[in-house]
């Protein structure tokens, strides 16, 4: 049921043990794992390095890159799988729109594509629901990195995770994903300015961080 394009036996022992564990957990819930020899994959019209899809279901990671990069992606996406199999409230949250209960990620993508319009209060509800899914996932991922002694810099991971979480506030201003090569969690002059912990109020974005991300990721003068 799995598609493994990489040579797992060449991985460091700790990483191999963890990858085998994640494959086993996924398969125990009838979720295939695809570790593909690709630089990127697509989901919901968005190009990315990996994803977990609950409707298919499948856990997919593009592995044609440095090991420490795709391992980080797999950590993150495996935590989305954990949210799904644990049936967490955050993962299962629906938002009412026009008397229908809708998936917040679906609503966000439709809004970004200008397929629907959302009033300011509803837009914030949608974006915060999406951010909460990712924030919970990142907190889980940071714990998993420590638990399995994965070769990932914990401090840097948390900083990049915070850049990702704050991005959802930025989307409400730009109505655009960042341009190619302008990801806030890859631009060192952005993510290195992020907090090194998750102990903060994510319902709002600090002005300095907002201005930094708009300037560096979207070339917007502030």
Predicted regions, residues:
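Auxiliary, metal-adjacent structural segments of Zn-dependent hydrolase domains
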Residues: 1-54, 66-67, 127-129
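Short pre-active-site segment immediately N-terminal to the catalytic Zn-binding motif
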Residues: 58-74
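Long, well-structured alpha-helical subdomains associated
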Residues: 68-69, 117-135, 139-222
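Active-site recognition of the HExxH zinc-binding catalytic motif
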Residues: 72-89
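Post-HEXXH active-site segment of zinc metalloproteases
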Residues: 84-129, 157-158
